[in-house]
Amino acid sequence: MNVALQELGAGSNMVEYKRATLRDEDAPETPVEGGASPDAMEVGKGASPFSPGPSPGMTPGTPRSSGLFWRVTCPHLRSISGLCSRTMVGFQKGTRQLLGSRTQLELVLAGASLLLAALLLGCLVALGVQYHRDPSHSTCLTEACIRVAGKILESLDRGVSPCEDFYQFSCGGWIRRNPLPDGRSRWNTFNSLWDQNQAILKHLLENTTFNSSSEAEQKTQRFYLSCLQVERIEELGAQPLRDLIEKIGGWNITGPWDQDNFMEVLKAVAGTYRATPFFTVYISADSKSSNSNVIQVDQSGLFLPSRDYYLNRTANEKVLTAYLDYMEELGMLLGGRPTSTREQMQQVLELEIQLANITVPQDQRRDEEKIYHKMSISELQALAPSMDWLEFLSFLLSPLELSDSEPVVVYGMDYLQQVSELINRTEPSILNNYLIWNLVQKTTSSLDRRFESAQEKLLETLYGTKKSCVPRWQTCISNTDDALGFALGSLFVKATFDRQSKEIAEGMISEIRTAFEEALGQLVWMDEKTRQAAKEKADAIYDMIGFPDFILEPKELDDVYDGYEISEDSFFQNMLNLYNFSAKVMADQLRKPPSRDQWSMTPQTVNAYYLPTKNEIVFPAGILQAPFYARNHPKALNFGGIGVVMGHELTHAFDDQGREYDKEGNLRPWWQNESLAAFRNHTACMEEQYNQYQVNGERLNGRQTLGENIADNGGLKAAYNAYKAWLRKHGEEQQLPAVGLTNHQLFFVGFAQVWCSVRTPESSHEGLVTDPHSPARFRVLGTLSNSRDFLRHFGCPVGSPMNPGQLCEVW
């Protein structure tokens, strides 16, 4: 197996350092497999990719995690701004119905929007005839400018003053025109764009003349079609999972089980099938020696999105009851008896509650210097003696030979010590039930409709999602993206990506980096030695744009998936093969150095990320399209869209976590004490600012969201300064027609409209307790109320809601 792929490990509770523009939970509630899954990987030339992508801001080596409810990375979406012309061709050609059915209200609103847009277009075209007679006129009347002006106008709410509530001013019209689609708990620009990308992929995979010279691309189509074989999946029912449970040694809930096989079951569940009971194990770059990979162990094992759901039992009584009902229903579908199944699942739930009690909250895990502990396997054995770590890790990383002296990095020593004690005092039958429950969670999305229906009931309680109307093909595209994401990316890039976009994006990154470094030179609170080291780090940031080159080389692409077998008539078996293959790929990484050219997101992903152990920023092809970027849009919109995303990722190198890493990607102290103290004073202001914001009466956690808030604020400033530098070099742009905004104002409106969003109250609560990003509304309000440039261009007086008087600035 010719692989150079790095296993990223996952787990919603892992230390979080891979910094993404948005959380993967902004993905849809399309069922994907398993709780916290370590099947996500980085991939580079000659490497083996799967379910890629970073969980929003996770630790070095943290991935997008495939969750039963949470797909960690890309959002599923539907665009308000349309696709660039080249992508639109790929989107429309030969396709049938590309999106799911809409509600009657949505259709009425869509019709009204089209009518208004047509009237606007007619007026603007008429104006265009007149204005084009005067070439000196400062209004842009190209077709692209007219279309984007219409999009902006229909998203605005002119009844609100921009100095009162800039989010409502920018997004009020969009919110009115975008009721939540059926089956979704949230809807935003990212979701919309991902839906469009999915429709492109559907067309490519269902093409009856599909004839690729790449075996990996052929595997991608076979995998996708096996997922679409609903009749075959229904015919098999629960039997594939029943057989698997029997093979492992049985499950007390459904029948006889081997009472003396804790280690064997743990090895099968966590090793062969890559579930994460109790803890997660993954291979990633050593934070203190980033040129080498090392075994890493972290806390894991909770099924619900956050420990809060287990511990605040009064507030979350409905969720816990729905979860227990879900557990019971799945146990019954697999052969459990009514009375005993609920009783035993209650015991499993109580065990998860005990795990939640010892799980360290996200906001207490932001300083990796404090939670990073490197030790040998023998020292790990002494710390957590409830299991044989050498036996377990040797099985997990077979055929590698390990010894007691093998180094391991542990994040959360107290957690592992306490989980070992918990295992020792828990009855063997409960341990077995919990382990098999982790396997059940991971695999049931590959089974028949009854399991999907059970999940939908839990989703409704947890996220406020009504009965799902997500078409099967969308679920299958997501699964294919998880399994063969870079082979799928090869198809996507060849069909849609404009190569010139890569060159233009590289130029924008350079401009934004220059603007950031110029601002760095003006900071009065930073000493010269630290400033010079920070400038060197900014200069050293490595950028990757669009896609990795190897995906367009058939032989190299085939090599990375060599050994992954695809059955044409068993989707369940294809998923099992994926878990097994990913385990082998993970083992292959330990003795190899990390590659700087590895990718952690597939090209079709609508997201971006910064990875501190490589000091790199990555922008997949999926996000390099409208509304973030379009070649024929005003520069104000491009800098306000993809420019702010670029600035955001670059600023992550200097947020409260990224700043701990040097230019080589190593975790070490490189700041002078006085500058570090000043940095903490500035971030304390921002933490307190965001602590004051509320959603439905519930406060934001300014500590949990600090890194993303720093990146949002720094990214906006860098992008705007880069735009001003562009204007100094090229001169003022023509203005858009009819919108009544200067181009400087347009920059800020373009930034805000990227974050237009709607979501259910339940989903909003889930975001507050799990997401390292602030809610969309406060990503706009919090950032702009700290921007002197915004306040000046919109004339917001001190004391107005958008200008409270005190500005919190870090970078």
Swiss-Prot record:
Membrane topology (Cytoplasmic): 1-106
Gene3D superfamilies the record matches: Collagenase (Catalytic Domain), Neutral endopeptidase , domain2
GO molecular function terms noted in the UniProt entry: metal ion binding; metalloendopeptidase activity; methyltransferase activity
Ranges facing Lumenal side: 128-811
Keyword Glycoprotein assigned: yes
Region Disordered, residue ranges: 22-64
SUPFAM superfamilies: Metalloproteases ('zincins'), catalytic domain (SSF55486)
Cofactor binding remark: Binds 1 zinc ion per subunit.
Residues annotated as glycosylated: N207, N211, N252, N312, N357, N424, N580, N673, N681
Membrane topology: Single-pass type II membrane protein
Subcellular location: Golgi apparatus membrane; Cytoplasmic vesicle, Secretory vesicle membrane
Main subcellular localisation: Golgi
Swiss-Prot/TrEMBL GO biological process terms: cell-cell signaling; G protein-coupled receptor signaling pathway; methylation; peptide hormone processing; protein processing
Keywords: Cytoplasmic vesicle, Disulfide bond, Glycoprotein, Golgi apparatus, Hydrolase, Membrane, Metal-binding, Metalloprotease, Methyltransferase, Multifunctional enzyme, Protease, Signal-anchor, Transferase, Transmembrane, Transmembrane helix, Zinc
pH curve summary: Optimum pH is 5.0-5.5. Inactive at neutral pH.
Disulphide connectivity of cysteines: C140-C145, C163-C796, C171-C756, C227-C476, C685-C808
Catalytically driven reaction(s): Hydrolysis of the 21-Trp-|-Val-22 bond in big endothelin to form endothelin 1
Active site positions, chain numbering: E649, D712
PROSITE patterns per UniProt: NEPRILYSIN, ZINC_PROTEASE
E.C. designation(s): 3.4.24.71
Annotated Zn(2+) binding sites: H648, H652, E708
Cofactor(s) named in the record: Zn(2+)
Gene Ontology CC annotations of this record: cytoplasmic vesicle membrane; Golgi membrane; plasma membrane; transport vesicle membrane
The family this protein is said to belong to: Belongs to the peptidase M13 family.
Purpose: Converts big endothelin-1 to endothelin-1. Also involved in the processing of various neuroendocrine peptides, including neurotensin, angiotensin I, substance P, proenkephalin-derived peptides, and prodynorphin-derived peptides. May play a role in amyloid-beta processing.
Name of protein: Endothelin-converting enzyme 2
Species: Homo sapiens
